[in-house]
Amino acid sequence: MQFDYIIIGAGSAGNVLATRLTEDPNTSVLLLEAGGPDYRFDFRTQMPAALAFPLQGKRYNWAYETEPEPFMNNRRMECGRGKGLGGSSLINGMCYIRGNALDLDNWAQEPGLENWSYLDCLPYYRKAETRDVGENDYHGGDGPVSVTTSKPGVNPLFEAMIEAGVQAGYPRTDDLNGYQQEGFGPMDRTVTPQGRRASTARGYLDQAKSRPNLTIRTHAMTDHIIFDGKRAVGVEWLEGDSTIPTRATANKEVLLCAGAIASPQILQRSGVGNAELLAEFDIPLVHELPGVGENLQDHLEMYLQYECKEPVSLYPALQWWNQPKIGAEWLFGGTGVGASNHFEAGGFIRSREEFAWPNIQYHFLPVAINYNGSNAVKEHGFQCHVGSMRSPSRGHVRIKSRDPHQHPAILFNYMSHEQDWQEFRDAIRITREIMHQPALDQYRGREISPGTECQTDEQLDEFVRNHAETAFHPCGTCKMGYDEMSVVDGEGRVHGLEGLRVVDASIMPQIITGNLNATTIMIGEKIADMIRGQEALPRSTAGYFVANGMPVRAKK
């Protein structure tokens, strides 16, 4: 089998590339996905409110676990990643958050990455998006990804939580992806007007999968990339339960889009990475790149949970006897409780003036429950998910075997810097202050977690060690740049090799201030134009907020 391009991984970036490259009917593309289809009648992935379900099994989730995390009481921590058409956009929380403009401007300060500034990237965010209230300087109106805005009156807790943040002295913003990210406001979500999850399989592949020049193979586990000298010329993979490899050749390029955990793993198995690590598994060295699998970053978060004194939370939706009605409303009308992910309000703040842009993110949820659906509080409640955005902690992904089915060693080194501890202490204390504002007085009952007895630095630190969880945002393991630990250049091309790019969240040099899916899609759109040799979209002229040392909040 011969194709112009072989794409490994049908996730948030891979599906973008598959769709854009096959717009040219003379370009042939093979898209390999280790998981299965995105079954449209499976409510677990299609109903926004069911977002916890895919994380509980292994049909749609790689269900990785970390090595014992040394600063988290040696806990082995969850590291869920999407498996199936759509990748992690098939199982994520559907929050459409792009990050802060200064994240991208910060990337662009690295030599060679100048065209990754916010204003250079904004046209590609817009290209990918159809926002339900129409386009403007910041938002698109005819892109493949459906973005839904929060509507007033859905749940009084959303408005109350935003108002409480404002009463605590923080800004109000009407668009966390617009002129000003900093502040509290409604949260956009990747949900269709029909109340379905807007994964990249739905948004992109639906328009491309019938093209004769696109071949999609599911249940295709990539074993390794084939090289001729320093040039990538094809891919070998295992189909289903087969132990006999299948191979295809790429006339132009192999595009690795397997995500921050699997992309470095595939490079290492293919002979690209740290020479000592590869020698340990008798993998012939194709090219030494010590940065492959290093620079691993993530967002860590905690839940601060409160009893709700009024019966307005989602607690009744957790009762089995209410779920048939919720399911029917969603299935036949695309409406009701099932049609929202219920992350409809949130915010970004600076915990201290020393941060030039927000370093703390909030997601508000009108129920008290773990992200993966476990440990639901059996009463009316609500919670804040809160965590730091740009931790200095760095980890790694390293193969443990040549077997593609063997999970790699993953270590995030969460909370390995004093800055991490200070940010989380600040975050808990600020959150408590926000939760005790007048806007929440009629709803707020007792603090369920951490509990009012948890007050000192030592007590807060122990709570974080035992209870903080991943926000499922791994990135950075094939970082873009030109220093000795970089893996790809500013166009995603792997240093020292030909015919091979990495295009996914692994190339982010530094993690962004917010959820990763929107920016991963943008990366796919931007590099798709580079691959095709097309001129970049014209730079945006939109304005954006810069704090420039402003106080973090208004004085009361």
Swiss-Prot record:
It holds the Pfam family GMC_oxred_C. It comes from the Bacteria. It comes from Escherichia coli O139:H28 (strain E24377A / ETEC). Belongs to the GMC oxidoreductase family. GO terms for cellular component: membrane. It is an enzyme of class 1 (oxidoreductase). Involved in the biosynthesis of the osmoprotectant glycine betaine. Catalyzes the oxidation of choline to betaine aldehyde and betaine aldehyde to glycine betaine at the same rate. It catalyses: choline + A = betaine aldehyde + AH2; betaine aldehyde + NAD(+) + H2O = glycine betaine + NADH + 2 H(+). The keyword Methyltransferase does not apply. This is Oxygen-dependent choline dehydrogenase. GO terms for molecular function: betaine-aldehyde dehydrogenase (NAD+) activity; choline dehydrogenase activity; flavin adenine dinucleotide binding. GO terms for biological process: glycine betaine biosynthetic process from choline. Its cofactor is FAD. Pathway: Amine and polyamine biosynthesis; betaine biosynthesis via choline pathway; betaine aldehyde from choline (cytochrome c reductase route): step 1/1. SUPFAM superfamilies: FAD-linked reductases, C-terminal domain, FAD/NAD(P)-binding domain. The keyword Oxidoreductase applies. Keywords: FAD, Flavoprotein, NAD, Oxidoreductase.
